[in-house]
Swiss-Prot record:
Subcellular location: Cytoplasm
Name recorded for this polypeptide: Eukaryotic translation initiation factor 3 subunit A
Domain of life: Eukaryota
PROSITE patterns found in the cross-reference section: PCI
InterPro entries reported in the protein's UniProt record: EIF3A (IPR027512), eIF3a_PCI_TPR-like (IPR054711), PCI_dom (IPR000717)
Entry annotated with the keyword Coiled coil: yes
């Protein structure tokens, strides 16, 4: 494993380097590290990972590491099964192809190892003889076990791993079935029967897994037609391989799987598939020794081919019908009492097995030999078969000729066995057995005893032992009475008159009944003969009885005809209703299932979307973390590479292992490096000093000792040099003299060539001078052009450089200006945010203070209201003590207004129809309501002098006294509105409504009135309004609209009659503003009269008024102005 995490491309390069130096295991570890690290899982594309995967699998195949290949394949599947399925398919196919090539190469190598024999004359060596004696294997088997089997095992494991990898992946479904077919071919090629069984079990387990309901949408669904067809094709291939390997049990299991898939499919399988299915099924039944179902399968194949196949030739029809006919005739004769009939109460397995086999053929019940022969005749198979097989049917099933039966059948069998490849040759033995049984039955009806030799002569194709076995089987299975007399060499047939062993007539040709049949048929024959005799003697004996019964039947029919007809109609109606109910229930159930499936699909889709989103987020997060980690690792690696370049750095890195280096950062490693360098420098300096001392000492001693030797050497050297110089000088002089003579001779020889040289030189010089002049001229021209071109290019380049420089400066200036603007805008936004936050904080604080004040006022108002209720309750108690009619005697006196009550009868007579009780004050509720006993209970106004807020004597409650505090800052007593304009004078009484006494209901209050007792609307309780809200316009909360219209608005001061005065000044609020709370114009109107006084200040008036305000004529109310000069106009409804 490498010391640091490799990038994928670097890991591939390093793996190739390991392979080049012969270390494939190290290369595999390097590539394996790439797939083990999760950080590379979703970062790199398949173009980067796919070559690494191919190299990784190549090394796994080379080293036969199937488990490591499995790990890499699973990681690669998780990476690219939803991104690029094609890449995954290419990788898996490449992996299996490499494994197959290596296995084939190993097989060739194993075969070649046997051929490489040193001595062809002595093939059996002593070693091979001993090995064959010990293990029982030949040389080829031993070679395969050592060379081929490891690769076969590796290839088998590769197939299993790939199938396990792709078993539930819908994106790789085709690849899964291709690999399954390749695995079948592998088992067939290398004759691996045990592996074939394991493979079939594995595929069956996978089919069961995908048949279960899965919550993941990416899984394989068996309900899809494509999946069903792929599984069906794979099982057909499995069946074919099982038949070729003669694994009949596996073939039968494959047939069951195929039938289950065809049953599961909603559409009918293709005729070609069904034909192949019936063909293979017939073969399996024949190999299992079940001739009955074999013939049934061939009959189904014939029906399918005749109905579905187009352009069928007459030869093909004859061949198929002949095959069906001979297979049906080859069915052994059924037993009179089969084994499962004898033990029907205790053992039902044979019957259940037959029923299961019938289901595979699509039959309702198990077939029989007789039923198949009937179908053969019904489907016209006999007439379409070959003539010789038609004769065979006639001889075995129709004619009774025991003397010539075996001879005729033998001739047909000889015609069949002439050709070894004849498909009917497999039926010869079965036909012989059926023929022998037919012979025994026919002979038993003709002869009572027959010599064994004569019997053997009639059975042309049988031996004595085989014939004896047939006789025993006839006694055992067909319940015939046969006795073999070995002493007299004869056979005796049943002569005992015992009970019959068969409940039906014997099939096949018969001449007469056997003696054993007489017991059963004797009574029946006697009854038939007696009835015939009676009918002959007295034919009219029962005629009257029959006529009476006939008349009775007709009468009963006529009586019950209508009733029976109605019953039948009712039954039909019930049946139709039941059908409709069932259809409706089924339709509802299907709709419900469809909705559930849609909901499940929608949930799956949502879950898949959420999963994909989570995966994307996780992938992005990991990619970001990986990039950060990669940058850190790259910096760390660069630092370590720099340290490695020095010897000190290499020593430092050797001192630490991989884990320590991973824990350290670049600064720590650099510090360690500097420290190590310092130590090395000190050690090196100390070493140099000691070496200096040694060298100085030895150098001095050496020089002192070598002085005399050097002097002697110099003297000898001087003598030798002198002698050497003399010798060299003499030889030099001799060589110079000889060289001089040779040069003179050469000079004399070359002087003769001087004229020719001069001529050639002048000629050549003339030619070359012209060429040189032309080339020089062309060069000068090209030089001038190149100079001009370069000057032009230089001008353009300088101009473009100046332009680009100007553009860069402009762009830089623009960026600086934008940056300044952006910073300024950010600063302004920050200041604005701080200002808004401060304003919100101030507003929240004001709102909190106002809320606290409102709560305090509400608590105070609640207390005051409670006190008022208690005082009013006491006043009502005192009032009950008075006489009920005392108030009538005081109508002309000076009683206070609170006690003066009008006559109810007179008031009712003079009162016009008006809605003053519903539009004015609401009737009191709770304990404040007047009693219903006919005595009027007076009500009292607020003792604190507040005006009555409603008509009809409704008391002013404590919460109504706060109605004037609706203005902003309601706790200041209305001082903020004193300077505003007033609607009426300070001493004027409140404005009256025209027409009736409803105008005596007191002043119009802006905060609500006593009719609903909902309390005042307090403006001061609301949070302060912003400037932007004030600009929209304030809504009037008074009754100005009612005053202008003169109508009878029933909600004085309510919110329903506000007018929207957006964008304009506020309406005239003179009704409530100005003055203090006790000013004259703010006081409520009196309960009676027109002087506008208060009942507490009018004790001296002559006529007390009734609180209930009697109704006055409407004309009197509208004839003149009021005391305050205002004239109200009645709104006529």
């Amino acid at each position: 494993m490498s010391r640091y995490m490799q990038r994928p491309e670097n890991a591939l390069k390093r793996a190739n380097e390991f392979i080049e130096v012969g270390k494939p295991a190290r290369a595999l570890d390097t590539l394996q590290e790439v797939f083990r690290i999760k950080k590379w899982t979703y970062t790199w594309s398949e173009s980067v990972i796919e070559p690494i995967m191919f190299k990784y699998l190549d090394l796994c195949v080379e080293l036969k590491k199937s488990h490591i290949a499995k790990e890499g394949l699973f990681q690669y599947r998780n990476m690219f099964q939803l991104v690029n399925v094609g890449s995954l398919e290419n990788v898996i196919r490449g992996y299996l192809k490499m494994a197959e090539e290596r296995t084939e190469a190993a097989q060739q190598q194993s075969s070649q190892a046997i051929l490489d024999i040193d001595d062809l004359d002595n093939l059996a060596t002593p070693e091979s003889i001993l090995m064959s004696a010990v293990c029982g294997e030949d040389a080829q088997d031993r070679s395969d076990r050592t060379i081929l089997l490891p690769w076969v095992k590796f290839l088998w494991e590769s197939y299993c791993q790939c199938l396990e990898l792709l078993k539930v992946n819908s994106h790789c479904e085709n690849l899964y079935h291709d690999i399954a077919k390749m695995a079948f071919g592998f088992c067939l090629k290398y004759n691996r029967k045990m592996e074939f069984r394991k493979l079939c079990e594995k595929l069956r387990k996978h089919l069961e897994d995908i048949s279960k309901v899965s919550s993941q949408t990416a899984n394989v669904s068996i309900s899809k037609p494509e999946t069903q067809q792929l599984n069906l094709d794979t099982r057909l291939n499995q069946l074919d391989c099982a038949i070729q390997m003669e694994l009949w049990l596996e073939a039968y299991k494959a047939i069951e799987d195929i039938h289950g898939l065809m049953t599961l499919s909603k559409k009918t399988p293709m005729p070609k598939t069904m034909a192949l299915y019936y063909q293979k099924l017939a073969m399996v039944f024949w190999k299992a020794g079940n001739q009955l179902f074999h013939a049934a399968a061939l009959l189904k194949l014939f029906q399918l081919s005749r109905d579905m196949k187009k352009n069928v030739t007459q030869e093909e029809i004859q061949r198929m019908t002949s095959h069906v006919l001979i297979a049906t005739l080859a069915i052994p004769l059924p037993s009179a009492h089969p084994e499962f009939d004898r033990f029907i109460e205790t053992d039902k397995s044979p019957l259940e097995k037959a029923q299961k086999l019938a289901v595979l053929l699509g039959l309702q019940q198990p077939p029989t030999r007789a039923s198949l022969l009937k179908d053969v005749l019904r489907l016209n198979v006999l007439q379409l078969a070959a003539p010789q097989f038609q004769n065979l049917y006639k001889w075995l099933e129709v004619e009774f000729d025991p003397l010539n039966l075996c001879e005729r059948v033998q001739n047909i069998i000889q015609e069949i066995t002439v050709d070894e490849n004849n498909p009917y040759a497999q039926y010869t033995q079965a036909l012989q057995d059926v023929t022998l049984v037919r012979l025994v039955r026919q002979v038993s009806q003709v002869y009572q005893s027959i010599e064994f030799s004569r019997f053997l002569a009639l059975a042309k194709f049988s031996t004595s032992f085989y014939l004896e076995r047939i006789l025993v089987d006839c006694v055992r299975h067909n319940d015939m009475q046969i006795t073999i007399d070995h002493r007299n060499h004869c056979v005796h047939f049943g002569t005992d008159l015992s009970e019959s062993q068969r409940e039906d007539h014997p099939d096949g040709p018969t001449l007469q009944s056997m003696p054993s049949e007489q017991v059963r048929s004797q009574l029946v024959n006697m009854s038939v003969v007696l009835h015939r005799a009676i009918a002959t003697i007295n034919p009219n004996r029962n005629k009257a009885e029959r006529d009476r019964l006939r008349a009775q039947m007709v009468k009963s029919y006529e009586e019950n005809m209508v009733k029976e007809h109605q019953r039948i109609l009712q039954r039909q109606k019930k049946i139709e209703d039941r059908k409709e109910y069932i259809e409706r229930v089924n339709l509802e159930r299907e709709e419900k299932e469809l909705r559930e499936l849609e909901e499940v699909a929608r949930q799956h889709k949502l879950a898949e979307q959420r999963r994909l989103e989570q995966e994307n987020e996780e992938r992005e997060r990991k990619r970001y973390e990986n990039e950060v980690q990669m940058i850190k690792e790259r910096n760390m690696k660069e630092k370590i590479d720099q340290i490695k370049q020095t010897a000190a750095g290499q020593k430092i890195l050797k001192k630490f292992d991989e884990e320590d280096i991973k824990k350290m950062n670049a600064e720590e490693i650099a510090a360690k490096e500097a420290e190590e360098r310092q130590k090395e420098r000190k050690a090196h300096d100390n070493n140099l000093k000691s070496q200096e001392k040694k060298i100085d000492y030895f150098e001095r001693a050496k020089r002192l000792e070598e002085i005399p030797l050097i002097e002697k050497y110099l003297e000898d050297k001087l003598v030798q040099d002198k002698q050497f110089w003399e010798k060299q000088e003499a030889s030099r002089i001799e060589a110079a003299i000889a060289e001089r003579k040779n040069a003179e001779a050469v000079q004399e020889r070359l002087k003769r060539m001087q004229p020719d040289r001069e001529i050639f030189w002048q000629k050549l010089k003339g030619e070359r001078s012209n060429q040189f002049a032309e080339k020089l001229k062309a060069f000068n021209v090209a030089l001038e052009e190149e100079r001009k071109r370069r000057l032009t290019e230089r001008v353009y380049e300088r101009r473009e450089e100046r332009r680009q420089k100007w553009l860069r400066e402009k762009e830089e200036e623009r960026r600086r200006a934008e940056e300044e603007i952006r910073k300024q805008r950010q600063e302004e936004e920050r200041i604005e945010r701080e200002r808004r936050a401060e304003e919100r904080r101030i507003e929240d604080e004001k709102a909190r203070l106002l809320e606290e004040k409102r709560r305090a006022r509400e608590e105070e108002a609640t207390k005051k209201a409670e006190e008022n209720r208690q005082m009013q309750a006491k006043a009502r108690e005192r009032e009950r003590e008075r006489e009920a009619d005392s108030w009538r005697d005081r109508r002309g006196g000076d009683a206070p207004a609170a006690a003066a009550q009008p006559n109810p009868a007179a008031q009712e007579a003079t009162k016009p129809e008006s809605g003053w009780r519903t539009a004015g004050a609401r009737e009191p509720r709770g304990e404040d309501a007047p009693k219903k006993d006919g005595v009027y209970q007076p009500r009292f106004r607020d003792v604190r002098g507040g005006g009555a807020g409603g008509a009809g004597g409704v008391e002013r409650r404590a919460d109504d006294q706060e109605s004037n505090k609706w203005r902003h800052g309601g706790d200041d007593g209305g001082k903020d509105d004193r300077d505003g304009p007033r609607r009426m004078g300070g001493d004027r009484p409140p404005m009256r409504r025209g027409g009736d006494d409803r105008d005596d209901r007191g002043p119009i209050r802006r905060g609500g009135d006593d009719r609903d007792d909902r309390g005042p609307i307090r403006r001061g309780d609301r949070p302060p309004m912003r400037d932007g809200e004030r600009g929209v316009g304030m809504r009037r909360e008074g009754g100005d609209r009612e005053r202008r219209d003169g109508g009878d608005r029933r909600d004085f001061g309510g919110n329903r009659d506000r007018r929207d005065d957006r964008g304009g000044p506020r309406r005239d609020d003179r009704g409530d503003r100005g003055g203090d709370r006790d000013s004259a114009w703010r006081r409520p109107a009196p309960r009676g009269g027109d002087d506008g006084g208060n009942w507490r200040t009018r004790q001296d008036q002559a006529k007390p008024k009734d609180d209930r305000r009697e109704e006055r004529p409407k004309e009197a109310r509208n004839t003149g102005p009021d005391e305050d000069g205002w004239t109200d106009v009645k709104h006529h409804r």
